[in-house]
């Protein structure tokens, strides 16, 4: 008997993890496999990061942290964004999480109600539609092929928006294609969203 909630039964297993498992099985059989599934770094954690983690544990820096993250960490991120990326974000505008997947899911759960539509340009990160379904929303997939550098146009966005549209998930650089929207392209999409007060853009 299936005792899981209807919400969970709407979800599909992760295609990424399924591919990774299949890759591991083939490798165990001696097959030469190039695994393009999980985005695993091909280098080890740098020594100075390992040392900092060990030092933190030795100094008992392992209690519950403030919800948005330690102030010193948020200040360091703010400085990094300004010095390396030319972006001005105050520490109070920065929230630290366990990773992008948690942040995206939190945002969707905070914004989407049952029946709301979320526009997702394709190709997309496989977790996006499942997160929308978990929030009882409806993923709306907008295809963007190689002929348009895997980027949706303002015209495509306009055509996809309905009275039920709640959000657009925009990933730039794209996972998995690596395509990057220019400032002008983003401005074009923003102009469309500005005409629809209920729709918000979540940039990952």
Which residues does each PLM region occupy?
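Short acidic/polar active-site loop segments enriched in Thr and Asp
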Residues: 32, 166, 199
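Conserved small/polar residues in nucleotide/adenosyl-binding loops
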Residues: 203-204
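Short N-terminal helix/helix-N-cap motif within the alpha/beta-hydrolase-1
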Residues: 99-105, 122-123, 178
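Glycine/Thr-rich phosphate-binding loops of Rossmann-like dinucleotide-binding domains
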Residues: 44-46, 104, 128, 177-178
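N-terminal small-domain helix-loop-helix segment of the aminotransferase-like
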Residues: 2-99, 106
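PLP-dependent aminotransferase-like
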Residues: 91-92, 109-170, 180-184, 188-191, ...
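Short helix-capping segments at alpha-helix termini
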Residues: 84-88, 194-199
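Flexible low-complexity scaffold tracts in large eukaryotic assembly proteins
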Residues: 172-175
